[in-house]
């Protein structure tokens, strides 16, 4: 972004270009084409001729480059400075959506509603780029901020920490659950406080009713939404329909999605209604909504088995998905459950064992690109169902293929885990490869 604003930018890092992941290498090469100077593989970069410095928040004061910057008394661009720059470059209203679960889905549905209402929407979510802050900056550089009527941003906790000075017209909190705590010293309170930065940034704030106990003490004019709870926006799920009641009336829309899509659609509707979108436009959008990739997505039938890809990986989200399929015979295959955060894999095993009789767990860690079979066994060893078939595999492709060995026509093959949220394109590609191989090998 600084390069786009006609500053001369140098990126320095002790790592060589080849040390970065392939997607990061591509981004760095593109930056170089656009005029950014890459000073990589340099353990002792010079600060001569430098006016200002931006340093990664994780860089310790003891790092050699940090000491050089301090000794030279250079101006340091803080996250607050950077966030204000970004805010000044976005001339339209911003809707910001955060939460532990449901933020990607809710962002997608909200975007669909506003597009149906005729708005030219600039939408950024982890569905397109796992690092949403990168997507926002990329959009500014490409002129999207100047070529829209409204911006709708998914705001994960990392993005909120970086862009905490955005002026948000309406902020929405879907929920807060125990996840990512390893990034906050194991403290749920610190994680909650990071999420609550959105409340401070927002002119109007809406939260799931489950969060009322942490929102009410800091904001007395917040609005709340939920399924079947007494609050400002009340949703009621029916057979292929959704009813929303609020202070100005109610409406019922045909709705062809399932499971957590109901509550997320109530959240999206609450944002739209608060902003002034009509019931008619919301109804049209929700009645036509067909879901989004890898969120309770039916990817087809293979050898008489319906295959569903879901990105649920936290206890509550997984339970919602498993409850939906409780009357079906399900063969379940799972990711390695650690990404940037360490997770309780025994809790996963105990939960899934209550619902399914075949559990196949992958031991491949996509973050460090290592096979960690202990992670798969930790899930499987916690399964208390004595009749369960438990299989550990070296990667998700093998896991997907083996689902056909342990299933029969009429069964549901279900995927769950965090890797789709971490790297959707790579993970789905590996899964689809396994499904193709398994359907042929075990037909």
Question: Where are the regions that the model predicts?
Answer:
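ATP-dependent carboxylate-amine ligase
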Residues: 1-20, 26, 36, 53, ...
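Short, basic phosphate-binding NTP loop
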Residues: 1-96, 117, 287
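Residue-level signal for inorganic ion chemistry
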Residues: 2, 53, 97, 154, ...
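Walker A (P-loop) phosphate-binding motif
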Residues: 83-129
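Flexible active-site lid/hinge loop adjacent to a nucleotide/diphosphate
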Residues: 140-215
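Active-site regions of enzymes building and remodeling cell-envelope glycoconjugates
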Residues: 25-38, 50, 70-76, 168-172, ...
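Adenine nucleotide phosphate-binding catalytic loops in nucleotide-utilizing enzymes
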Residues: 185-192, 220-319
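Short beta-strand "acidic-cap" motif of Rossmann-like dinucleotide-binding folds
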Residues: 8-13, 121-123, 152, 224
């Amino acid at each position: 972004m600084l390069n786009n604003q006609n500053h001369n930018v140098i990126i320095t890092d002790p790592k060589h270009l080849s040390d970065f992941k392939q997607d990061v290498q591509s981004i760095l090469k593109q930056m170089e084409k656009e005029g950014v100077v890459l000073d990589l593989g340099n353990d002792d970069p010079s600060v001569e001729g430098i006016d200002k410095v931006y340093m990664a928040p994780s860089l310790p004061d003891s790092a050699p480059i940090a000491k050089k910057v301090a000794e030279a008394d250079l101006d340091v661009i803080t996250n607050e400075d950077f966030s204000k720059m970004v805010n000044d470059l976005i001339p339209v209203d911003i809707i910001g959506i955060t939460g532990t679960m449901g933020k990607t889905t809710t962002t997608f549905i909200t975007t669909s509603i506003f597009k149906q209402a005729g708005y030219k929407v600039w939408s950024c979510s982890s569905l397109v780029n796992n690092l949403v802050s990168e997507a926002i900056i990329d959009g500014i550089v490409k002129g999207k901020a100047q070529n829209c009527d409204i911006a709708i941003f998914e705001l994960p906790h990392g993005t909120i920490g970086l862009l905490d000075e955005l002026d948000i017209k309406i902020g929405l909190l879907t929920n807060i659950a125990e996840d990512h705590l390893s990034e906050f010293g194991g403290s749920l309170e610190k994680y909650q406080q990071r999420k609550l930065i959105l409340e401070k940034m927002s002119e109007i704030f809406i939260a799931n009713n489950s969060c009322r106990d942490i929102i009410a003490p800091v904001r007395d004019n917040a609005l709340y939404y939920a399924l079947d709870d007494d609050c400002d926006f009340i949703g009621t799920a029916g057979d292929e329909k959704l009813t929303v009641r609020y202070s100005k009336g109610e409406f019922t829309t045909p709705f062809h999605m399932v499971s957590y899509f109901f509550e997320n659609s109530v959240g999206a509707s609450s944002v739209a209604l608060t902003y002034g979108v009509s019931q008619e436009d919301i109804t049209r959008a929700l009645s036509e909504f067909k879901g989004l990739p890898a969120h309770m997505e039916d990817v087809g039938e293979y050898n008489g088995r319906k295959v569903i890809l879901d990105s649920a990986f936290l206890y509550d989200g997984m339970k919602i998905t498993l409850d939906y399929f409780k009357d079906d015979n399900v063969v379940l295959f799972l990711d390695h459950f650690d990404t940037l955060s360490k997770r309780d894999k025994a809790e996963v095993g105990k939960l899934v064992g209550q619902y399914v009789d075949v559990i196949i767990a992958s031991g491949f860690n996509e973050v460090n690109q290592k096979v960690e079979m202990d992670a798969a066994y930790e899930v499987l060893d916690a399964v208390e169902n004595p009749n369960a078939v438990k299989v550990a595999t070296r990667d998700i492709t093998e896991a997907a293929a083996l689902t056909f060995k342990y299933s029969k026509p009429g069964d549901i093959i279900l995927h769950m885990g965090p890797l789709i949220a971490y790297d959707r394109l790579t993970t789905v590609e590996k899964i689809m490869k396994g499904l193709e191989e398994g359907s042929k090998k075990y037909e």
